[in-house]
């Protein structure tokens, strides 16, 4: 009766009934009951999957390879410290692996080192290997070194991350970041996992900086690269340098570069001039949180003495540090100049010190700091030949200025010979002061500052800005481009303001809580385990933003797991390499033995005295540490089956599906009842 009645329905009622049936079918498919049958080919859920991944791996499409930067572990990123983690070695071929996703890197490196004879230390990058695409600061090091080996490897077993490729060696002139490669297991394979709008590079300096990407190149000169006596110089221009120290942050170096240009304290001769910073100077000036959109704002800086000592070339010859860096005048001898004359003694330039994007301690107050220059009496120091020479010490006093917001842009067409400061005052020349007088109190009149064109002339040969470094004022309040720490995700979505990055107290923390990923503010696209950027392969040269959502501590644990696993695998690699070498030597010995009937050591000599080391204890310790950190420690909401929520929440989808089916049956019954 029912079936016959349905078949005899009028056309309009049949359409209405069919519509309801399709709605019910779609509803049931959306909340379907899991009816799959587990068989032998189904991948089993391991303890690590339960504790860390919180899902089973049912398809390889759920795997995503991720490059994690070492700086997230809290390692030192300054050039003197970072280069100590690299070393040259021969006899080990390089290995290259690919990865799909990565992090924004605050510090990247680019090396161009030559041997004393002028030959290259590092190999050229093979076809297809490009520089790491997302670096806030690129530390470009040029110079010389002995380079005792064919390739430069990482002493701690990490990779050198390039654009979607990770290599075990450093390539010449190619930007890289230090890191490891790990794999994420996604809750379920989705083709649109990384779908979002592409990140477009800004084409000019007038675009909104919130849609652009910023990168700054900082140049250094090195002598004795790869040795314990390596010396580094921060390059202001081709002739002016500052002795580099581990305590110098990139932001401080940028301010230092700005100060050297605007105060006119650069070499005005044809020889090199080296400055040394007062060891009591606070080098955290200008430091700002990771990957905030850079704003060329000014902030209140406490009054302090910022002094530089000019180091004579007679006392320290640095002429041979870089064959690539020579004087513009080929007929000039750069090794015999004693450069004590930097600028005219009546120089009264007032310059700006930019905070490079970090908010002021008092968020609502922004000030323009000024530096007044004055000369101290020359200091007489004995030279290496027991002679004396005068070394001037320039005292730079920083004082408060009026509350202004500076909007000017920096371009790349810099002049390396101009000593014109980017900002001067018409309020009258500064009064010269000696070491016994109080600091200057002259203020900068914002109405009399020079135009941005003057600033562009002395922007500096050192720092190459791929994008305007200052577009927004201090009062704009707009958040960073598309980057934030995981701890600040809520602030990103709700529009809250970021706070300054806290100092890392422990020298070697287990994990840095301030992890920074390429993200998007589209909360609707959030799925998965962590905030991960995607470097392709949607289109060549176009980078896709992707959002993965997770609790704060999970990706931190994944990072540490990848780091410790990589170290253990590096020990395996070393043992395997030695075994391979040992086997080759044995093969050669056997070949010679069959031909010459001589003993192995008699034929090979000292080369036969090699044996593979036993790294079992080290590898076991690493594995035990991983088990202790991730298996023995239960993550939140991951208790045993006695936990009601943990044990029963897996039935929630099934319950919803059953409820949907019941509702569908009742609805169908009501429709039939209504029709008949």
Swiss-Prot record:
Instruction: Please list the residue ranges that the record places on the Extracellular side of the membrane.
Output: 33-650
Name the reported effect of residue 368 to P: In strain: Isolate Bouee-96
Q: Name one GO cellular component term.
A: virion membrane
Lipid tethering residues (S-palmitoyl cysteine):
670, 672
Q: Which residues lie on this side of the membrane: Cytoplasmic?
A: 672-676
Q: Which GO terms describe its biological process?
A: clathrin-dependent endocytosis of virus by host cell; entry receptor-mediated virion attachment to host cell; fusion of virus membrane with host endosome membrane; symbiont-mediated suppression of host innate immune response; symbiont-mediated-mediated suppression of host tetherin activity
Q: Where is this region: Receptor-binding?
A: 54-201
| Ranges in coiled-coil conformation | 554-595, 615-634
- Residues of the site described as Involved in receptor recognition and/or post-binding events: 57, 63-64, 88, 95, 170
- According to the UniProt record, what happens if one changes residue 379 to T? In strain: Isolate Bouee-96
How does it get modified after it is made? The signal peptide region modulates GP's high mannose glycosylation, thereby determining the efficiency of the interactions with DC-SIGN(R). N-glycosylated.
Q: Give the record's keywords alphabetically.
A: Clathrin-mediated endocytosis of virus by host, Cleavage on pair of basic residues, Coiled coil, Disulfide bond, Fusion of virus membrane with host endosomal membrane, Fusion of virus membrane with host membrane, Glycoprotein, Host cell membrane, Host membrane, Host-virus interaction, Inhibition of host innate immune response by virus, Inhibition of host tetherin by virus, Lipoprotein, Membrane, Palmitate, Secreted, Signal, Transmembrane, Transmembrane helix, Viral attachment to host cell, Viral attachment to host entry receptor, Viral envelope protein, Viral immunoevasion, Viral penetration into host cytoplasm, Virion, Virus endocytosis by host, Virus entry into host cell
Low complexity biased stretches = 414-427
List the carbohydrate attachment sites: 40, 204, 228, 238, 257, 268, 296, 317, 333, 346, 386, 413, 436, 454, 462, 563, 618
Residue ranges annotated as transmembrane are 651-671
Bias (Polar residues): 314-335, 447-464
Note down the stretches annotated as region Fusion peptide: 524-539
The region annotated as signal peptide is 1-32
Please give the positions of the paired cysteines in each disulfide bond. Answer: 53-609, 108-135, 121-147, 511-556, 601-608
Instruction: Give any extra note attached to this record.
Output: Filoviruses entry requires functional lipid rafts at the host cell surface. Essential for infectivity, as it is the sole viral protein expressed at the virion surface.
User: Which family, according to the similarity comment?
Assistant: Belongs to the filoviruses glycoprotein family.
What's the protein here called?
Envelope glycoprotein
Q: Which organism is it from?
A: Zaire ebolavirus (strain Gabon-94)
Gene label: GP
């Amino acid at each position: 009766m029912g079936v016959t009645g349905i078949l005899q329905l009028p056309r309009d009622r049949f359409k209405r009934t069919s519509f309801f049936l399709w709605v019910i079918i779609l509803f049931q498919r959306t909340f379907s009951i899991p009816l799959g049958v587990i068989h032998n080919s189904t991948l089993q859920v391991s303890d690590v999957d339960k504790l860390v991944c919180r899902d089973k791996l049912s398809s390889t499409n759920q795997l995503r390879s991720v490059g994690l930067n070492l700086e997230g572990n809290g390692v030192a990123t300054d050039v003197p410290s970072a280069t100590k983690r690299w070393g040259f070695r021969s006899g080990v071929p390089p290995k290259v692996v690919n990865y799909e996703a990565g992090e924004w890197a605050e510090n990247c490196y680019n090396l161009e080192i030559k041997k004393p004879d002028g030959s290259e230390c590092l190999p050229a990058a093979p076809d297809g290997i490009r520089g790491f695409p997302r670096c806030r600061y690129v530390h470009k090091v040029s110079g010389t070194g002995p380079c005792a080996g064919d390739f430069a490897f990482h002493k701690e077993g990490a990779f050198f991350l390039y654009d979607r490729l990770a290599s075990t060696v450093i390539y010449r002139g190619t930007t890289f970041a230090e890191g490891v490669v790990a794999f994420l297991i996604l809750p379920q394979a989705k083709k649109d996992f990384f779908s979002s709008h592409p990140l477009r590079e800004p084409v000019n300096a007038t675009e909104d900086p919130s849609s652009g990407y910023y990168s700054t190149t900082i140049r250094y000169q090195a002598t004795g690269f790869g040795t314990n006596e390596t010396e580094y110089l921060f390059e202001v221009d081709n002739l002016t340098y500052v002795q580099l120290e581990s305590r110098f942050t990139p932001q401080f170096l940028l301010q230092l570069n700005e100060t050297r240009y605007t105060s006119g304290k650069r070499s005005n001769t044809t020889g090199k001039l080296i400055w040394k910073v007062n060891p009591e100077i606070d080098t955290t000036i200008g430091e700002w949180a990771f990957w905030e959109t850079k704003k060329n704002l000014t902030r209140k800086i406490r009054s302090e003495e910022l002094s530089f000592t000019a180091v004579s070339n007679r006392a320290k010859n640095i002429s041979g540090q870089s064959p690539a860096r020579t004087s513009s005048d080929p007929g000039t001898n750069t090794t015999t100049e004693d450069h004590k004359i930097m600028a005219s003694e009546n120089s009264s330039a007032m310059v700006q010190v930019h905070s490079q994007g970090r908010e002021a301690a008092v968020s609502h107050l922004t000030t323009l700091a000024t530096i007044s220059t004055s000369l101290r009496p020359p200091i007489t120091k004995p030279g290496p030949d027991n002679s004396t020479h005068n070394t001037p010490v320039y005292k730079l006093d920083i004082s408060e200025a009026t509350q202004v917001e500076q909007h000017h842009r920096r371009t790349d067409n810099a002049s390396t010979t101009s000593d014109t400061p980017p900002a001067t005052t018409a309020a009258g020349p500064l009064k010269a002061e000696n070491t016994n007088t109080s600091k200057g109190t002259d203020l900068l009149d914002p109405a009399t500052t020079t135009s941005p064109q003057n600033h562009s002339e002395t922007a500096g040969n050192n720092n190459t800005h791929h994008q305007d470094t200052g577009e927004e004022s201090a009062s704009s309040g707009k958040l960073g481009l598309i980057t934030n720490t995981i701890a600040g995700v809520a602030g990103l979505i709700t529009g809250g303001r970021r706070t300054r990055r806290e100092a890392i107290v422990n020298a070697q923390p287990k994990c840095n809580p301030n992890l920074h990923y390429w993200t998007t503010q589209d909360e609707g696209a959030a799925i998965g385990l962590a905030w991960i950027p995607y470097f392709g392969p949607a289109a060549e040269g176009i980078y896709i933003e992707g959002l993965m959502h997770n609790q704060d501590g999970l990706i931190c644990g994944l990072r540490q797991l990848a780091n410790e696993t990589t170290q253990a695998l590096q020990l395996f690699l070393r043992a395997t390499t030695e075994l391979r070498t040992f086997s080759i030597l044995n093969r050669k010995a056997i070949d010679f033995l069959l031909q010459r009937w001589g003993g192995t050591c008699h034929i090979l000599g000292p080369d036969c005295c090699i044996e593979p080391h036993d790294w079992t204890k080290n590898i076991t310790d690493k594995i035990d540490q991983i088990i202790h950190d991730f298996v023995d420690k239960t993550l939140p909401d991951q208790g045993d089956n006695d936990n009601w929520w943990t044990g029963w929440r897996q039935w929630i989808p099934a319950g919803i599906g059953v409820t949907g089916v019941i509702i569908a049956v009742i609805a169908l019954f009501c429709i039939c009842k209504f029709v008949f």
